[in-house]
Amino acid sequence: MLFAPLQPYATHALQVDATHTLYVEESGNPDGIPVLFVHGGPGGGTEAWHRQFFDPQRYRIVLFDQRGCGRSTPHASLVDNTTWHLVDDMERIRVHLAIDAWAVFGGSWGSTLALTYAQTHPARVLGLVLRGIFLLRKAEIDWFYQQGSSWIFPDAWEAFEAAIPADERGDYVGAYYRRLTSDDPKVRLAAARAWSRWEGATSKLIPTADAAARFGESAFAEAFARIECHYF
C-alpha cells in the first residue's frame, strides 16, 4: 500500500566533495521518526512516489539522489563514485540534517547500500526495511546480464544482446562498459539506452509503459547505465 502523494517541505543541494553535489529532500512530519530512503540502480535516482512508502504523519522522510544520478551533479559522473563514497555521503546527509539516528529503507541496490551503511554505522540506525534484496554477488550479476533472466524475457534479451558483437558476448558487462565509457557520445548513448531498456523491461514480471518510457529517456539512461555498469 502506498500513501497519498505529497511534496517535500525542504530541499538541499549538499556539496560532499570538490566534485559532487547531492540533491536531498525532506517530506512528511518534520518532528516525526527520521527515515532515509535509499534508491536502487546504482544510478536509478529517486522519484516522487518513493515518498509514498511512508506515513507522512509519522515519519520525517529523507530522499537523496546518489552521486551522478537524478538531480545530483555532475550528471553521470563516475569520478569518486564507489560504495564507500555513498556510505560516507549518507553520514554527511545525517549530520547536515541534525539527525541522531534514523531508520533506513532500501530496495534492490538500495538494500545492498543500506546494509553496508548499517554495518558501518550501527549506532546511527534505528532499524532496516529491505525489499527486493540484491547483494551484488557475481552469481546475481551473471544471472541478470549473462544467462538466466534471458530465458524469462527472451524478446527483451534479443535487443540487449544485439548491441554487442558476437565475439564480445562472453562478457556483456565488460562489453557494455567499454561503450558506456567511450569518447564518442553517440556510442555511449546507444549503449546506455540498450542497457537501460533491458532493465526497464525486466524490473517487473509484467512491464509497464511508464517504466519503458522512463528507462528509455536519454538523460536517465546515460546516468543509470554508466553508473550501474561501473559498479557491476
Language-model features: locations:
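Alpha/beta-hydrolase fold catalytic core
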Residues: R193-F232
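Conserved HGGG/HGGXW glycine-rich cap/lid loop of the alpha/beta-hydrolase fold
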Residues: V16-P74
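An accessory alpha-helical subdomain
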Residues: P165, D171-S203, A212-A213
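N-terminal cap/lid segment of alpha/beta-hydrolase-fold proteins
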Residues: M1-E26, E228
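A catalytic-pocket lid/entrance helix-loop region that shapes and gates access to the active site
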Residues: A123-Y176, Y231
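Conserved acidic catalytic loop of the alpha/beta-hydrolase fold
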Residues: W84-W102
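Short glycine-enriched, charge-decorated loop/helix-capping segments at active-site entrances
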Residues: H75-N81, Y145-Q146
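Conserved hydrolase catalytic core segment
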Residues: D100-A139
